[in-house]
């Protein structure tokens, strides 16, 4: 109900101005204006919206809040536009103004959404000069080359993908960046190991199959730890790689390509799109980052290292903490690369991406790192006045014992194996249910449903949690058909598809929607919250808000369908209720798609 909320806010401001012209004029002079403090009603019995402006006005106006509220209501009642939207306002408690939207307005909103593929969600507007919206960068996933993706990459990948989907749906040009770890000293040992175990690949191959990358990495690391000569050669390889030695670059490229192929298999399964732009992309910009910081007067030499001391951030000794951008040996580090990336992403094309909002989706353990480099980038003047740098932190994935999720052997859980198990468990549950129901389905149906449900369960279990907190991973909970789970939401969509199979025309049109039952109005009001929820997710970057909404919508729909006849109802109620079924299905499908979850017609 965003459009109604905007109209009501405007009408409330005008009513307050008319009721208290002197206070309104004074507020305008101060550059603020009097805020009607309009918000969705906290409980259904309070109507649809609640305006709380009377309470903060009591002290400056030296009047009781209820008296102020009454004066505002008097002005609202002479506004024909307001009266066309709302019933007579109710003053509650110390001075809250409760607003209830007229039933015919709610019905008209439902009618409009039935004809709108965007379900009332507006596209973001461009700049005032008519330009298109500026790009938003979402930096997520970001695995390391020569290491297999593990459960720790799950959260960044699917949270980042969901946020990118919401931003894209709102109309923002989104640059989905995969800042893979494709550079660094570890490549010295990896290249040395590759040259020794597969030297022929460096002469002839455009691709190399190193088998299990995790095993390959461990072998290289073991040799590096145990063999002094291997260590020496590895360090020499780092120098060669940084110097552009063709053979070292070929080995590096082969390692990157194999990792890239393995990563893509995961991304394809999860239906995640990414543009790879690894750490190595910024190598050419690192020296100029240090030069810029020096010119701006931020750079300080400390024990041979070049660093920027942070403002307002001190260590245990009370001294400002540094962000090191060049080590004493002349080398660069993660902070240098991240600063180069920030500068590039905000720089105007063709020198950069021209973004005005850059979002980093990483684990909460990197919060201090990003706070530091964000401050440095701001002080260096690389962030435009309207630019927004945002870190989207998330907690750990834990086992049901509350500890970091591990295999029985104590190893990190590989993401590929976790997804495999989710699908296998979903298939087992499905086969058991089919047997109990006496249903005979072909193998292609079983494979499709198991794959969809298994992957959806993993995604939704993660996204439905507040990302800031740790969450406990449980296959049993996430695959349950009851509760706030993907199977529960998918089943609501399937249930509506079943109505159509039983002869209910979900595309039926009716000249005027009419509702009379409490359950109908509850569903109407829940459906009309969708646009506000999307706007909230876009701003606060919390996908769990969308999950909570979709779960509550499914609950309201199930109560409606269980308590009110649909197919057996008389006209015009039958058509009106079928319209609500269709809008519910459309809303669930669109909402789930923004979470990266496809739906099913049958389960």
Curated annotation (Swiss-Prot):
Name the Enzyme Commission number(s) assigned to this protein: 6.1.1.19
Gene3D superfamilies associated with the record = Arginyl tRNA synthetase N-terminal domain (3.30.1360.70), HUPs (3.40.50.620), Isoleucyl-tRNA Synthetase, Domain 1 (1.10.730.10)
State the organism's lineage.
Bacteria, Bacillati, Cyanobacteriota, Cyanophyceae, Synechococcales
Which Pfam families does the UniProt entry name for this protein? Answer: Arg_tRNA_synt_N, DALR_1, tRNA-synt_1d
Top-level lineage group: Bacteria
Name of this chain's protein: Arginine--tRNA ligase
The GO annotation for biological process reads: arginyl-tRNA aminoacylation
Q: Which GO terms describe its molecular function?
A: arginine-tRNA ligase activity; ATP binding
The UniProt entry's sequence similarity note says: Belongs to the class-I aminoacyl-tRNA synthetase family.
The record's subcellular locations are: Cytoplasm
